């Protein structure tokens, strides 16, 4: 791209951002963005966070419209917590492989086969699965919430089996796991990670607990996106191999500009291990959804009513 073309592109983006901000102000709209969104979306968001932080913000804001820059289950959660608000998802096809791994009809059958179990569902699931759950959790609070469940209760944990195994190990509780997983966190290369560790002596490996066990045992710190951010801010190392969606690195570099953050390649050797769904949202689509007041999240009122209970229970137990 020539320097003239670059200048034009920057100017077009500046104009786009300016119009988005102006329309948000007029519509009393708030932009919520997950850490896995593209840097330019993170920069215009009114609030950036992990699933737990975003849930809290969705439940407590004065906006009339929530523009959720994340994926479908996140926007659904915002609608459940703020049913009287308009919730817009810039790209309605921004789904989640993990949520897709747990269809509500099959999950209902799984529950019926285990009727004496307390159902804990990771927030990365559909509204219909949330409505069948006793408690929702995030990767930030899963261990602490599981520890609060009476020991005489048997527990189902769904839909992420990798997170479930990590929670099981750290909580000391036996969990009946649903066999789901995230395409991003499943595809990191152990061989590439070992090579990077050898090439970067003194570095540390930080991982999201959705990663598979063979990667977690090689990690120096495991935690949710917000906890990974906290760790790199407090830790004294200078270089980190990052085993989660690379969108988080934008915030890591902002917090610690003098530290190095290395994306771990996937099994095909590509340093492009991005969530294809998260990256469907763009500035253009944000502007379009503001102009058209769509795509909006619509849920059955009964699903909202039932799904609200385990989400609210999570928020209350997390305080």
For each of these PLM feature ranges, what is it?
Residues 1-242, 249, 253-319:
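Active-site loop-to-helix "anion-binding N-cap" substructures in soluble metabolic enzymes
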């Amino acid at each position: 791209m020539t320097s003239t073309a670059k200048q034009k592109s920057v100017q077009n983006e500046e104009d786009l951002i300016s119009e988005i901000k102006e329309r948000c102000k007029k519509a009393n709209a708030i932009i919520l963005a997950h850490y896995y969104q593209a840097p330019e979306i993170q920069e215009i968001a009114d609030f950036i966070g992990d699933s737990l932080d975003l849930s809290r913000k969705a439940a407590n804001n004065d906006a009339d419209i929530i523009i959720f820059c994340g994926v479908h289950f996140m926007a659904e959660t915002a609608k459940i917590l703020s049913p009287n608000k308009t919730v817009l998802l810039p790209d309605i096809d921004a789904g989640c492989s993990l949520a897709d791994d747990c269809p509500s009809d099959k999950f209902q059958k799984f529950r019926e086969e285990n009727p004496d179990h307390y159902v804990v569902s990771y927030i990365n699931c559909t509204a219909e699965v949330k409505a069948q759950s006793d408690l929702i959790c995030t990767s930030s609070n899963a261990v602490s919430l599981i520890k609060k469940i009476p020991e005489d209760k048997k527990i189902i944990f769904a839909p992420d089996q990798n997170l479930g195994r990590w929670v099981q190990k750290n909580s000391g509780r036996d969990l009946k796991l649903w066999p789901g997983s995230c395409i991003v966190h499943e595809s990191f290369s152990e061989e590439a990670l070992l090579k990077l560790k050898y090439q970067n002596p003194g570095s540390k490996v930080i991982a999201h607990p959705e990663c598979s066990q063979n990667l977690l045992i090689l990690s120096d710190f495991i935690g949710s996106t917000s906890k990974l951010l906290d760790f790199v801010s407090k830790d004294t190392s200078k270089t980190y191999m990052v085993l989660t969606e690379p969108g988080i690195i934008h915030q890591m570099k902002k917090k610690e500009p003098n530290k190095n953050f290395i994306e771990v390649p996937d099994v095909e050797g590509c340093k492009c291990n991005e969530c294809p769904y998260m990256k469907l949202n763009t500035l253009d689509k944000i502007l379009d959804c503001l102009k058209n007041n769509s795509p909006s999240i619509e849920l059955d009122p009964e699903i909202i009513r039932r799904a609200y209970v385990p989400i609210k229970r999570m928020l209350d137990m997390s305080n």
